[in-house]
Design a protein with these regions (language model features):
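Acidic/histidine-enriched active-site and ligand-binding environments that engage anionic O-linkages
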Residues: 147-156
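ATP-dependent carboxylate activation and anion-phosphoryl transfer catalytic cores
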Residues: 7-26, 48-50, 71-73, 89, ...
Length: 452
């Protein structure tokens, strides 16, 4: 086992990794920007090193600064968390060259899955179902039109190098294609420094389903089942749950076995998430793979009793899957997670500032992952996520009731949060009945006369 790990992240996920380190008897080293000097991840780490000013490019995304901190602290490994440098293959390579273990997959696999059209090709070759679409990068809007005619409208053009809805456009007819193609290309180039696009058939009213896997460095891959992530706004997830009401036990087993075989074939290791769109006929189509721990990993932890972050660390330290899991995966009950963001619940504008009161809920089956606290300051420089409220219950109905109760008891004052939005979602009849898709939030907000 490692003696010391540096966490190349901040706030909630950094604190989550620190908890795992402490339980494994590993010393945790935090890094922080000047804006995060009073953050809880700094307080609870065994060591903490300031790596620069508040701006991401000068601190958390500054690879030389992060590696320098790791060398100063003499760490064995680096855990990247999610976001920031977590899926940066160059960062993983620099860790390797510096003699520091990167807690994640090999750089070449991260790079493969980061180039979306190559990931599609690799998964198609391995037998994973994908949507009809282009083969490789599309060079021009003329070539895009040729593919669109083959696939059939509507289609969606996507940035090869990115995600989160940027560099993405839905095209419903031939007349729209040139303008939307150029707009997606420009947005992708601005967001990711790479304007490459590919195309897929667009699925109307899909669900967003993802599967969690763990793979050791000895060839063993295990599926931990799926998460339902369809409640999202502008491709940003708001609420997740496990299991999905639309995935049967037979589907769960079939897809899980297929993914384990596919990932073993490409030499994948550590935690990973494979994302799918589900069409109206409940067929799953691969869209991308995230080669890191996900924000929403707690819902899987709650229904499987597997600590995914501790598993990541153990796998990176060379443990075999039989020692990591200590038995077969068994799913119990239902879990829901609400992302609490520092945003106006109707306008969705960021809400930085001092938290004047903070009282997270408790009780049976309730978990709160957060680095926020009373009198703490939410800086304006970073992602708006301040807490994740997670519940577990015997079934979905009880989980909804428990989450509703927990939201009512979650006090955050001094800043706006999305807690009121989550209360309204949990009370919605369609949500409670499981009648939703990725367009649910837009329809929900339009129905209530709120902003989208």
């Amino acid at each position: 086992m490692f003696k010391k790990i540096l966490i190349a992240n901040r706030a909630e996920i950094a604190l989550r990794v620190i908890c795992a380190c402490k339980e494994l008897g590993v010393r945790a080293v935090a890094i922080y920007s000047e804006a995060d000097r009073n953050s809880l991840h700094v307080r609870f780490a065994d060591e903490a090193i300031c790596i620069g000013p508040p701006r991401l490019a000068e601190s958390y995304l500054n690879i030389p600064a992060v590696i320098s901190a790791a060398e100063i602290a003499n760490v064995d490994a680096i855990h990247p968390g999610y976001g920031l440098l977590a899926e940066n293959a160059n960062f993983a390579e620099v860790c390797e060259m510096s003699g520091i273990k990167f807690i994640g997959p090999r750089p070449e696999v991260t790079r493969l899955m980061g180039e979306k059209e190559k990931a599609r090709a690799a998964m198609k070759k391995a037998g994973v179902p994908i949507l009809p679409g282009s083969e490789g990068i599309i060079a021009s809007d003329g070539e895009a039109l040729e593919w669109a005619k083959q696939v059939g409208f509507p289609v969606i053009v996507k940035a090869s190098a990115g995600g989160g809805g940027r560099g993405m456009r839905i095209v419903r007819n031939e007349e729209e294609l040139p303008g939307l193609f150029k707009a997606a290309q420009a947005e992708a180039a601005g967001a990711f420094g790479n304007g490459d696009l590919y195309m897929e058939k667009y699925v109307e009213h899909p669900r967003h389903i993802e599967f969690q896997v763990l793979a050791d460095e000895h060839g063993s891959v295990v599926s931990l089942g799926e998460r339902e992530c369809s409640i999202q706004r502008r491709h940003q997830k708001l609420l997740e749950e496990s299991p999905s009401t639309q995935v049967t036990p037979e589907m769960r087993t079939q897809i899980g076995e297929m993914l384990c075989k596919s990932l073993a074939a490409i030499g994948y290791w550590n935690a990973g998430t494979i994302e799918f769109l589900m069409d109206k006929d409940r067929r799953l189509h691969f869209i991308e793979m995230n080669t890191r721990i996900q924000v929403e990993h707690p819902v899987t932890e709650m229904v499987t009793d597997v600590d995914l972050v501790k598993s990541q660390i153990m796998i990176a330290a060379g443990a075999k899957m039989s020692d990591v899991l200590m038995g077969p995966i068994v799913h119990r009950g239902h879990s829901i997670e609400c992302r609490v963001n520092a945003e106006h619940p109707e306008k969705f504008t960021p809400s930085a500032g001092k938290i004047t009161a903070f009282n997270p809920p408790g009780g049976t089956g309730v978990r709160v992952d957060t680095a926020a606290y009373a009198e703490g300051v939410i800086p304006p420089y970073y992602d708006s996520l301040i807490a994740k409220l997670i519940v577990r219950a015997k079934d979905r109905s009880e989980a909804i009731s428990r989450m509703s109760r927990a939201l009512d008891m979650f006090i955050v004052e001094g800043i706006y949060t999305t807690i009121p939005l989550h209360r309204r979602i949990l009370a919605d009849e369609d949500f409670r009945a499981g009648n939703f898709d990725t367009g649910f939030i837009e329809r929900f907000l339009a129905k209530s006369g709120k902003a989208t």
